[in-house]
Swiss-Prot record:
Its main location: other. Has been crystallized as a homohexamer with an acidic central pore with a diameter of 26 Angstroms on one side and 14 Angstroms on the other. In solution has been shown to be a pentamer. NCBIfam families: PRK15448.1. One of its GO terms (biological process) is ethanolamine catabolic process. One of its GO terms (molecular function) is identical protein binding. It comes from the Bacteria. One of its GO terms (cellular component) is bacterial microcompartment. The lineage of its organism: Bacteria, Pseudomonadati, Pseudomonadota, Gammaproteobacteria, Enterobacterales. This is Bacterial microcompartment shell vertex protein EutN.
Length: 95
């Protein structure tokens, strides 16, 4: 699993049928201190995350399982919206 911050939404009206009508989000990965690390990606989201929110992601076959379709071309899927992150006894993020 990975942590990321949602930086935007992608509108794609023509897409593979395996993606249905799920929302596509632009996300930036977060390092252990909670800072964006510059790695951007597109994740499928069917739980309703919004811009600026921290999210928990899964990739590969786990993303396809989370999307409930082993045959869809999904490589990154939002599985949670983060409320709080504590690392080393310190709160590094609180919604």
């Amino acid at each position: 699993m990975k942590l990321a911050v949602v930086t935007g939404q992608i509108v794609c009206t023509v897409r593979h049928h395996g993606l249905a009508h799920d929302k596509l989000l632009m996300v930036e990965m977060i390092d252990p201190q909670g800072n964006p690390d510059g790695q951007c990606a597109v994740a499928i989201d069917n739980i309703g995350a919004g811009t600026g929110e921290w999210v928990l992601l899964v990739s590969g076959s786990s993303a396809r399982q989370a999307h409930k379709s082993e045959t869809s071309p999904v490589d990154l899927c939002v599985i949670g919206i983060v409320d709080e992150v504590v690392s080393g006894g310190q709160v590094i993020f609180h919604k």
